[in-house]
Amino acid sequence: SERLKLYREEIIIMVDVIYFNMLLNIGLLVLIAALLTNLEFVRTLFLEEQSSIFSKTALAVIFGIISIVSTYTGTYTDGAIINTRVIGVLAAGLLGGPYVGMLTALIAGIHRYLFDIGGFTAVSCAVSTLVEGILGSVFSARFKSGKMKQAEICVLTAAAEVGQMVIILLISKPFDAAWHLIRQIAVPMIMMNSCGMLIFLRTFDMVFIRKEGQ
Protein backbone atom coordinates (compact mmCIF):
# COMPACT_ATOMS: atom_id res chain seq x y z
CA SER A 1 0.00 0.00 0.00
CA GLU A 2 0.98 3.65 -0.34
CA ARG A 3 1.23 4.07 3.43
CA LEU A 4 3.61 1.10 3.73
CA LYS A 5 5.73 2.46 0.89
CA LEU A 6 6.02 5.84 2.59
CA TYR A 7 6.92 4.16 5.88
CA ARG A 8 9.71 2.18 4.21
CA GLU A 9 11.05 5.32 2.55
CA GLU A 10 11.09 7.10 5.92
CA ILE A 11 13.00 4.19 7.48
CA ILE A 12 15.58 4.22 4.66
CA ILE A 13 16.09 7.99 5.00
CA MET A 14 16.42 7.70 8.79
CA VAL A 15 19.00 4.90 8.51
CA ASP A 16 21.00 6.94 6.00
CA VAL A 17 20.97 9.90 8.39
CA ILE A 18 22.12 7.66 11.26
CA TYR A 19 25.08 6.30 9.28
CA PHE A 20 26.05 9.75 8.02
CA ASN A 21 25.89 11.35 11.47
CA MET A 22 27.88 8.52 13.03
CA LEU A 23 30.51 8.91 10.31
CA LEU A 24 30.76 12.61 11.14
CA ASN A 25 31.02 11.84 14.85
CA ILE A 26 33.78 9.29 14.30
CA GLY A 27 35.64 11.82 12.17
CA LEU A 28 35.32 14.36 14.98
CA LEU A 29 36.71 11.89 17.53
CA VAL A 30 39.66 11.04 15.28
CA LEU A 31 40.35 14.76 14.81
CA ILE A 32 40.28 15.28 18.59
CA ALA A 33 42.59 12.30 19.07
CA ALA A 34 45.01 13.64 16.45
CA LEU A 35 45.09 17.05 18.12
CA LEU A 36 45.58 15.54 21.58
CA THR A 37 48.46 13.30 20.52
CA ASN A 38 50.30 16.37 19.25
CA LEU A 39 50.22 17.95 22.70
CA GLU A 40 53.39 17.32 24.69
CA PHE A 41 51.42 17.06 27.95
CA VAL A 42 49.18 14.29 26.59
CA ARG A 43 52.09 12.37 25.05
CA THR A 44 53.88 12.51 28.40
CA LEU A 45 50.83 11.01 30.14
CA PHE A 46 50.86 8.05 27.77
CA LEU A 47 54.61 7.48 27.74
CA GLU A 48 55.36 7.57 31.47
CA GLU A 49 57.12 4.38 32.57
CA GLN A 50 55.34 4.37 35.94
CA SER A 51 52.07 6.25 35.66
CA SER A 52 51.13 8.29 38.72
CA ILE A 53 47.60 8.69 40.06
CA PHE A 54 47.66 12.22 38.66
CA SER A 55 48.55 10.96 35.17
CA LYS A 56 45.88 8.27 35.25
CA THR A 57 43.26 10.70 36.52
CA ALA A 58 44.22 13.24 33.85
CA LEU A 59 43.84 10.58 31.15
CA ALA A 60 40.46 9.56 32.56
CA VAL A 61 39.28 13.17 32.46
CA ILE A 62 40.48 13.51 28.85
CA PHE A 63 38.72 10.33 27.75
CA GLY A 64 35.70 11.30 29.84
CA ILE A 65 35.43 14.58 27.95
CA ILE A 66 35.79 12.72 24.64
CA SER A 67 32.95 10.42 25.68
CA ILE A 68 30.78 13.34 26.77
CA VAL A 69 31.36 15.02 23.40
CA SER A 70 30.10 11.80 21.80
CA THR A 71 26.89 12.04 23.81
CA TYR A 72 26.30 15.67 22.81
CA THR A 73 26.98 15.03 19.12
CA GLY A 74 24.79 11.92 18.97
CA THR A 75 21.56 11.64 17.02
CA TYR A 76 18.40 11.68 19.16
CA THR A 77 15.72 9.19 18.11
CA ASP A 78 12.86 7.47 19.92
CA GLY A 79 14.15 8.39 23.37
CA ALA A 80 17.73 7.25 22.69
CA ILE A 81 20.95 8.91 21.57
CA ILE A 82 22.73 7.13 18.72
CA ASN A 83 26.34 7.88 19.56
CA THR A 84 30.01 6.89 19.52
CA ARG A 85 30.50 7.02 23.30
CA VAL A 86 31.70 3.41 23.42
CA ILE A 87 34.84 4.43 21.50
CA GLY A 88 36.07 6.82 24.17
CA VAL A 89 35.17 4.59 27.11
CA LEU A 90 36.50 1.34 25.66
CA ALA A 91 39.68 3.02 24.39
CA ALA A 92 40.29 4.49 27.84
CA GLY A 93 40.38 1.02 29.35
CA LEU A 94 42.49 -0.50 26.59
CA LEU A 95 45.04 2.32 26.46
CA GLY A 96 45.07 3.45 30.08
CA GLY A 97 44.28 0.33 32.10
CA PRO A 98 41.59 -0.43 34.70
CA TYR A 99 41.85 2.81 36.71
CA VAL A 100 41.57 5.02 33.63
CA GLY A 101 38.91 2.82 32.06
CA MET A 102 36.62 2.68 35.08
CA LEU A 103 37.01 6.36 36.00
CA THR A 104 36.25 7.32 32.40
CA ALA A 105 33.19 5.05 32.46
CA LEU A 106 32.00 6.68 35.68
CA ILE A 107 32.42 10.18 34.25
CA ALA A 108 30.69 9.31 30.98
CA GLY A 109 28.02 7.14 32.61
CA ILE A 110 27.01 9.70 35.22
CA HIS A 111 26.92 12.42 32.57
CA ARG A 112 24.75 10.24 30.30
CA TYR A 113 22.26 9.73 33.12
CA LEU A 114 22.18 13.43 34.06
CA PHE A 115 21.97 14.43 30.40
CA ASP A 116 18.50 12.92 30.11
CA ILE A 117 17.20 12.17 33.61
CA GLY A 118 14.06 10.08 33.38
CA GLY A 119 14.63 9.48 29.68
CA PHE A 120 13.70 6.19 28.04
CA THR A 121 17.31 4.94 27.91
CA ALA A 122 18.97 7.16 30.53
CA VAL A 123 19.54 4.39 33.08
CA SER A 124 20.24 1.59 30.60
CA CYS A 125 22.81 3.64 28.67
CA ALA A 126 24.50 4.77 31.89
CA VAL A 127 24.77 1.14 33.03
CA SER A 128 26.05 -0.03 29.64
CA THR A 129 28.72 2.69 29.76
CA LEU A 130 30.03 1.19 33.01
CA VAL A 131 30.06 -2.25 31.38
CA GLU A 132 32.09 -0.85 28.49
CA GLY A 133 34.62 0.50 30.98
CA ILE A 134 34.90 -2.95 32.55
CA LEU A 135 35.43 -4.61 29.16
CA GLY A 136 38.19 -2.18 28.20
CA SER A 137 39.87 -2.67 31.57
CA VAL A 138 39.73 -6.47 31.38
CA PHE A 139 41.38 -6.57 27.95
CA SER A 140 43.89 -3.79 28.66
CA ALA A 141 46.85 -6.06 29.44
CA ARG A 142 46.33 -8.06 26.25
CA PHE A 143 46.01 -4.89 24.18
CA LYS A 144 49.12 -3.26 25.66
CA SER A 145 51.16 -6.41 25.07
CA GLY A 146 50.40 -6.13 21.36
CA LYS A 147 48.66 -9.50 21.27
CA MET A 148 45.25 -8.07 20.40
CA LYS A 149 44.61 -8.17 16.66
CA GLN A 150 42.44 -5.68 14.81
CA ALA A 151 39.74 -8.30 14.31
CA GLU A 152 39.65 -8.88 18.07
CA ILE A 153 39.26 -5.15 18.71
CA CYS A 154 36.33 -5.08 16.29
CA VAL A 155 34.75 -8.09 18.00
CA LEU A 156 35.26 -6.53 21.45
CA THR A 157 33.64 -3.27 20.36
CA ALA A 158 30.78 -5.15 18.73
CA ALA A 159 30.34 -7.20 21.91
CA ALA A 160 30.19 -4.00 23.96
CA GLU A 161 27.50 -2.63 21.67
CA VAL A 162 25.53 -5.89 21.72
CA GLY A 163 25.76 -5.73 25.51
CA GLN A 164 24.31 -2.23 25.41
CA MET A 165 21.38 -3.45 23.30
CA VAL A 166 20.70 -6.28 25.75
CA ILE A 167 20.82 -3.87 28.70
CA ILE A 168 18.37 -1.54 26.95
CA LEU A 169 15.99 -4.46 26.43
CA LEU A 170 16.32 -5.51 30.08
CA ILE A 171 15.96 -2.08 31.68
CA SER A 172 14.05 0.25 29.36
CA LYS A 173 10.28 -0.19 29.53
CA PRO A 174 7.97 -0.90 27.81
CA PHE A 175 9.74 -3.82 26.15
CA ASP A 176 7.99 -3.31 22.79
CA ALA A 177 9.32 0.24 22.54
CA ALA A 178 12.82 -0.94 23.51
CA TRP A 179 12.69 -3.69 20.88
CA HIS A 180 11.52 -1.21 18.22
CA LEU A 181 14.44 1.06 19.12
CA ILE A 182 17.00 -1.76 19.00
CA ARG A 183 15.83 -2.79 15.54
CA GLN A 184 16.64 0.71 14.31
CA ILE A 185 19.95 1.43 16.02
CA ALA A 186 21.71 -1.91 16.60
CA VAL A 187 23.26 -2.52 13.17
CA PRO A 188 24.57 1.02 12.51
CA MET A 189 25.96 1.40 16.04
CA ILE A 190 27.68 -2.00 16.01
CA MET A 191 29.15 -1.58 12.53
CA MET A 192 30.21 2.06 12.70
CA ASN A 193 31.62 1.98 16.22
CA SER A 194 33.63 -1.19 15.51
CA CYS A 195 35.28 0.48 12.51
CA GLY A 196 35.62 3.79 14.32
CA MET A 197 37.40 2.14 17.24
CA LEU A 198 40.17 0.86 14.95
CA ILE A 199 40.78 4.30 13.45
CA PHE A 200 40.64 6.00 16.86
CA LEU A 201 43.13 3.59 18.45
CA ARG A 202 45.42 3.83 15.43
CA THR A 203 45.62 7.59 15.97
CA PHE A 204 46.79 7.08 19.56
CA ASP A 205 49.18 4.34 18.43
CA MET A 206 51.11 7.02 16.54
CA VAL A 207 52.33 8.31 19.92
CA PHE A 208 54.11 5.03 20.60
CA ILE A 209 55.35 4.67 17.02
CA ARG A 210 56.93 8.13 17.27
CA LYS A 211 58.61 7.14 20.53
CA GLU A 212 60.11 4.01 18.96
CA GLY A 213 61.39 6.06 16.04
CA GLN A 214 63.28 8.48 18.28
Question: Would you name each region that the model predicts?
Answer:
Residues E9-N38, A60, G74-V86, D116-Q214:
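Membrane-embedded alpha-helical hairpins and interfacial helices in multi-pass inner-membrane proteins
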Residues N38-T44:
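C-terminal ends of transmembrane helices
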Residues L45-S52:
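Membrane-interfacial, low-structure loops and terminal tails that flank and connect transmembrane helices
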Residues K56-T75:
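A generic, lipid-embedded transmembrane alpha helix
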Residues F63-S67, R85-L90, T104-R112:
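Hydrophobic, membrane-inserted alpha-helices
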Residues D78, V89, G93, G101-A105, ...:
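Alpha-helical transmembrane segments and their helix-entry boundary regions
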Residues G96-G97, I110-D116:
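Interfacial segments of multi-pass membrane proteins
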